[in-house]
A protein has these predicted regions:
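Intrinsic-disorder/low-complexity loop/linker signature
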Residues: 17-19, 35, 45-47
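A structural detector for beta-sheet-dominated domains
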Residues: 4, 12, 28-29, 42, ...
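Short, surface-exposed beta-edge/turn micro-motifs
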Residues: 5-8, 22-25, 36
């Protein structure tokens, strides 16, 4: 699965521990922030940053999150 910044995904397990709640999120590049967290996850229903990861690979390999669909 090839994800990039700007990818829109349907995921479960990100905001709550429940795998019943599906969230639509976008991966946002935060490299200019200067922190070690370059990958921000934006919840598209609330337009809030809901998670920080060091990289897209870190997001993909997170055991709690399941990617259901890559929309764009």
């Amino acid at each position: 699965m090839k994800l990039r910044y700007g990818s829109i995904l349907k995921v479960v397990g990100l905001i709550s521990d429940s795998y019943e709640e599906v969230d639509t999120v976008m991966l946002v590049n935060n490299i200019t922030d200067g922190s070690k967290y370059n990958c921000k996850v934006l919840d598209l229903s609330t337009y809030e940053i809901v998670a920080d990861f060091e990289s897209i690979e870190d997001f993909i390999t997170n055991k709690q999150i399941k990617i259901l669909e890559v929309i764009a």
